[in-house]
Amino acid sequence: MTTTEFPSAVAKARFVRVSPRKARRVIDLVRGRSVTDALDILRWAPQAASEPVAKVIASAAANAQNNNGLDPATLVVATVYADEGPTAKRIRPRAQGRAFRIRKRTSHITVVVESRPAKDQRSAKSSRTRRAEASKAAAKAPAKKAPAKKAPAKKAPAKTAAKKTPAKTSETSDAKGGSD
């Protein structure tokens, strides 16, 4: 965890009719990403839980922009989690007078977005060029010969079992208990 504090904004959606386990599956896709990337990912995610999570992220971004005056381009999903809400219990009638319980789970989704300064493009470019130059230098340098491998020792010829020639058909029928 870093000790530097960035300006942030919070949004919560409570009593959302989605299981916390299913919401966490979607939340894990967007944690630590920029808000625009997160919304793009959730727009195309096939899970039903992606819609309420996207709404909360959009709400947190709007809170950051309107209440705190933060630049929406620098917003990052810093913290996002789903806690368990109350569970509504229903009954499903079953055979012979039995009843099974249906648990309709709810969750509380919390999103914290932070305005992190954009990473310096020069430093990213310089590291990229340094890597490219290093690979070019490695390609130009004469390649070292790999150490010579020892030739595998010749194995002694394996003793071959003497091949038995098939016996005459009359002998084989005698062995099987047949008669001529």
Curated annotation (Swiss-Prot):
<feature type="region of interest" description="Disordered">
    <location>
        <begin position="111"/>
        <end position="180"/>
    </location>
</feature>
<dbReference type="GO" id="GO:0006412">
    <property type="term" value="P:translation"/>
</dbReference>
<dbReference type="InterPro" id="IPR018260">
    <property type="entry name" value="Ribosomal_uL22_CS"/>
</dbReference>
<dbReference type="GO" id="GO:0019843">
    <property type="term" value="F:rRNA binding"/>
</dbReference>
<comment type="function">
    <text>The globular domain of the protein is located near the polypeptide exit tunnel on the outside of the subunit, while an extended beta-hairpin is found that lines the wall of the exit tunnel in the center of the 70S ribosome.</text>
</comment>
<feature type="compositionally biased region" description="Basic residues">
    <location>
        <begin position="142"/>
        <end position="166"/>
    </location>
</feature>
<feature type="compositionally biased region" description="Basic and acidic residues">
    <location>
        <begin position="171"/>
        <end position="180"/>
    </location>
</feature>
<dbReference type="Pfam" id="PF00237">
    <property type="entry name" value="Ribosomal_L22"/>
</dbReference>
<keyword id="KW-0694">RNA-binding</keyword>
<comment type="subunit">
    <text>Part of the 50S ribosomal subunit.</text>
</comment>
<dbReference type="InterPro" id="IPR036394">
    <property type="entry name" value="Ribosomal_uL22_sf"/>
</dbReference>
<dbReference type="InterPro" id="IPR005727">
    <property type="entry name" value="Ribosomal_uL22_bac/chlpt-type"/>
</dbReference>
<dbReference type="InterPro" id="IPR047867">
    <property type="entry name" value="Ribosomal_uL22_bac/org-type"/>
</dbReference>
<keyword id="KW-0687">Ribonucleoprotein</keyword>
<protein>
    <recommendedName>
        <fullName>Large ribosomal subunit protein uL22</fullName>
    </recommendedName>
</protein>
<comment type="function">
    <text>This protein binds specifically to 23S rRNA; its binding is stimulated by other ribosomal proteins, e.g. L4, L17, and L20. It is important during the early stages of 50S assembly. It makes multiple contacts with different domains of the 23S rRNA in the assembled 50S subunit and ribosome.</text>
</comment>
<dbReference type="GO" id="GO:0003735">
    <property type="term" value="F:structural constituent of ribosome"/>
</dbReference>
<keyword id="KW-0689">Ribosomal protein</keyword>
<comment type="similarity">
    <text>Belongs to the universal ribosomal protein uL22 family.</text>
</comment>
<dbReference type="InterPro" id="IPR001063">
    <property type="entry name" value="Ribosomal_uL22"/>
</dbReference>
<dbReference type="GO" id="GO:0022625">
    <property type="term" value="C:cytosolic large ribosomal subunit"/>
</dbReference>
<keyword id="KW-0699">rRNA-binding</keyword>
